[in-house]
Amino acid sequence: MDSLVVSNIRQRPLRSAISIIGVALGVALVMLFTGLAHGMSDDLQKRSSNVTAEIIFTRPGSMGLTTSSANLSTKYAELLKEVEGVESTTPVIRYFYPSGSFGVDQVEGIEWDSFSKMNNIRLIQGHAPVADDEIVIDETKAARNHPVGSSLKVFGPKLYRVAGIYAPESGARAKMSIGSLQRALESPDKCTFIFVKVKNPSDQVAVARRIDAKFPGNKIQFTREVFASIENSIPGLNIFLRVLVVLILLCSGQCSILNRSARLVHRRDWINFAMSRSH
């Protein structure tokens, strides 16, 4: 069997090379796109897991993995503190915007003092965002040639100045003051969701029930459940990967079929030529 394979490669080196390249290209593309998709979801999950709040309080339908809206009143941040078992709260606006030709990026509007204290993040350079044109970014984004004092286009044509760099990475890589993002989105006193930190993490279920009883009609999620299933929550990711694998395998198979068809046509032409010469 081995000698048959070797002899076939020696007799038809071009056809064999094309077949090998076609299969190798298909396998490489499957590995590339699958790795990119899983890498992006793993990165998002890692950044989200650095959030230490136990509960997310929001409006139904206001927050998805790639879409969000600011329709929750920030007044809830103070009202939630009155619930038994709640230690602290902080409102957040999460805004998604086009990045590059096909990508999507996000920016968060936060109250720096309450957000950084709750999630144990600190400034390693610069200062917190104060002015409407100031943002802070994490170390990963800063490493992409965005030092403190540089300008960065976050969304729209407006440039924002990098006021500081924070660590560890948590949520969106770029953050601005919640007031600045409210004015940019024309959504005064609104946010996308509110992080709720409970006094005793083991009581988070009971605290969530108290919140639901006091503020019915809103949506309450546990961060441990939201961030643990990020990959499964990405709309159509698994379907996209399956379709991608099938398409690439079909293309690789088609290359082999076309290669063989070309050889058969070439052989037929030689046979016809030989027969015509014999007559």
Where are the regions a protein language model picked out?
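Alpha-helical transmembrane segments of multi-pass inner-membrane proteins
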Residues: 17, 21, 49, 240-247
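A short beta-strand structural signal in non-transmembrane regions
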Residues: 55-59, 141-142, 163-168, 188-214, ...
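Hydrophobic, regular-secondary-structure patches
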Residues: 28-106, 209-213, 217-219
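Short amphipathic alpha-helical coupling elements at transmembrane boundaries
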Residues: 4-11, 42-49, 53, 216, ...
